Amino acid sequence: MVVNVVIVAKKYFLFITLLIIQVSLPAHAGTDEKGWFNTFTDNVAETWREPEHYDLYIPAITWHARFAYDKRKTDRYNERPWGGGFGQSRWDEKGNWHGLYVMAFKDSWNKWEPIGGYGWESTWRPLPDDNFHLGLGFTAGVTARDNWKYIPVPVLLPLASIGYGPATFQMTYIPGTYNNGNVYFAWMRFQF
C-alpha cells in the first residue's frame, strides 16, 4: 500500500506543484499582462500551429555522475543511448527557441525509454557571427521507463545548448539521490 501511495504521489507531483503555484500567484485584475501559465500554453500552441523548422534528434551520451553511484552499478549501466526523435520548432521575436519533440532512446538498463514534450531556451548570440548560439531553459514533458512498468511520468528539467547554424548540442541533467538519477543526458538536434 505504501508503494502505491508513493507511485501516485510521484505521478501527480508536477501537476499538483503547478496547480499550487498557479493558485498562489496573485491575479493581475484589469491588466493586459498574461500569467506564466497562459504564456506557456500560448507558446506551446503557437509552436504546434506555426513551426518554422522540423528537427531531427540523435541521442549522444548519458553519463551517470560517478560521485553519486557505486562503481559496480556504473560499470553495468548503458551510457550510449542510441535512438532518435523528431520535433518541430520556432524562434520567437526575442530570438528564443521553442520546440515540441518526441524521442526514444536506450536507457541506463539498455531498455527503450520514450520522452515527449515542450522545450524552451533563452538564446544568446555572443559572437559577431549570429550562427553561433548558446541557450539556457527548460523542458516539460512526459517519459516512461521499463523499470516503472512504462507508467507515464511527468518531467520538468533544465536545458542547455551550444550550437552553430542548424546543428545544436542540447543537454539536460536529471537530478536524483545516491544510486538513482544524477544523470547527464545530451543529444544532437539538427534543424531543417
From Swiss-Prot:
Keywords: Acyltransferase, Cell outer membrane, Membrane, Signal, Transferase
Highest taxon listed in the record's lineage: Bacteria
Active site: H64, D107, S108
Marked site positions, Role in the phospholipid gating: Y178
Keyword NAD applies: no
Documented EC number(s): 2.3.1.251
Subcellular locations according to the entry: Cell outer membrane
GO biological process, one term: lipid A biosynthetic process
Record's catalysed reaction(s): a lipid A + a 1,2-diacyl-sn-glycero-3-phosphocholine = a hepta-acyl lipid A + a 2-acyl-sn-glycero-3-phosphocholine; a lipid IVA + a 1,2-diacyl-sn-glycero-3-phosphocholine = a lipid IVB + a 2-acyl-sn-glycero-3-phosphocholine; a lipid IIA + a 1,2-diacyl-sn-glycero-3-phosphocholine = a lipid IIB + a 2-acyl-sn-glycero-3-phosphocholine
Annotated site residue numbers, Role in lipopolysaccharide recognition: K73
A single GO molecular function term of this UniProt record: acyltransferase activity
GO cellular component terms, semicolon-separated: cell outer membrane
Cleaved signal peptide residues: 1-29
Subunit structure: Homodimer.
NCBIfam families hit by this protein: PRK11045.1
Function, in words: Transfers a fatty acid residue from the sn-1 position of a phospholipid to the N-linked hydroxyfatty acid chain on the proximal unit of lipid A or its precursors.
Family in the record: Belongs to the lipid A palmitoyltransferase family.
Protein name: Lipid A acyltransferase PagP
Organism, scientific name: Citrobacter rodentium (strain ICC168) (Citrobacter freundii biotype 4280)
Top-level taxonomy: Bacteria, Pseudomonadati, Pseudomonadota, Gammaproteobacteria, Enterobacterales
Gene name linked to the record: pagP
